[in-house]
């Protein structure tokens, strides 16, 4: 599952198309290298109830090289976010990685493990993987499918522009969103990129 051979120019053109479409409705996007206390405060003030452990600067270490946020603003006000982080797991199997990381961040006393819930083909994936999460849209800015698609696809473009070695991009989505078809709208499972789980 490798990213097709796209040049940085082609990726930047793709991102520009998405950003231009958003601008037609008064939205701007920005790639922010690190979650600062000011940005975290702004995200929480926009209505997001919490920052997940995987993207919390209190629980995880970040550099300009291993993570970033993409923000969505309308008339200067933050109304949406998504975050991305790369983990270079090398030869460690994806299932083992998830088990190790998520058992610390989301401890459960019973129930199936994260690894046990993975299809066998994914459990053995290794290399450079990107986790995207903390996607949030203010309630007043939900429901516009074209806006959502453009924002998330611009974030995908930013991921692949920054980390062209990525072998897989994954996210956890709510079951209700999956049933409503939103996961495909976001671009996951859509076949948009070979690096996205299909």
Question: Predicted segment positions?
Answer:
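Polar low-complexity intrinsically disordered regions
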Residues: 1, 75-77, 139
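A conserved beta-strand-loop-helix scaffold within acyl/acetyltransferase catalytic domains
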Residues: 23-128, 133-135
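Sequence termini and other peripheral, non-core segments
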Residues: 1-38
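Acyl-donor binding region in acyl/amide transferases
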Residues: 95-193
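Generic preference for hydrophobic/aromatic residues in regular secondary structure cores
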Residues: 24-34, 169, 188-189, 193-194
């Amino acid at each position: 599952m490798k990213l097709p051979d796209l040049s940085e120019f082609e990726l930047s053109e793709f991102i520009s198309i998405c950003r231009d479409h958003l601008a037609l409705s008064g939205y701007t996007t920005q790639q922010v290298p690190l979650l600062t206390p000011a940005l975290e405060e702004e995200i929480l003030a926009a209505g997001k109830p919490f920052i997940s452990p995987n993207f919390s600067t209190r629980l995880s270490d970040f550099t300009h090289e291993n993570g970033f946020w993409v923000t969505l603003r309308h008339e200067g006000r933050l109304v949406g976010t998504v975050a991305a982080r790369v983990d270079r797991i090398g030869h460690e199997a994806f299932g083992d990685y998830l088990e190790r990381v998520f058992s610390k961040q989301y401890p459960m006393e019973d129930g199936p493990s994260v690894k046990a819930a993975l299809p066998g083909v994914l459990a053995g994936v290794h290399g450079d993987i990107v986790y995207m999460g903390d996607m949030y849209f203010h309630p007043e800015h939900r429901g516009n499918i074209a806006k959502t698609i453009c924002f998330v696809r611009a974030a995908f473009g930013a991921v692949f522009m920054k980390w062209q070695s990525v072998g897989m991009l994954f996210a956890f989505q709510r079951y209700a969103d999956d049933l409503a078809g939103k996961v495909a709208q976001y671009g996951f499972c859509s076949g948009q990129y070979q690096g996205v789980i299909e």
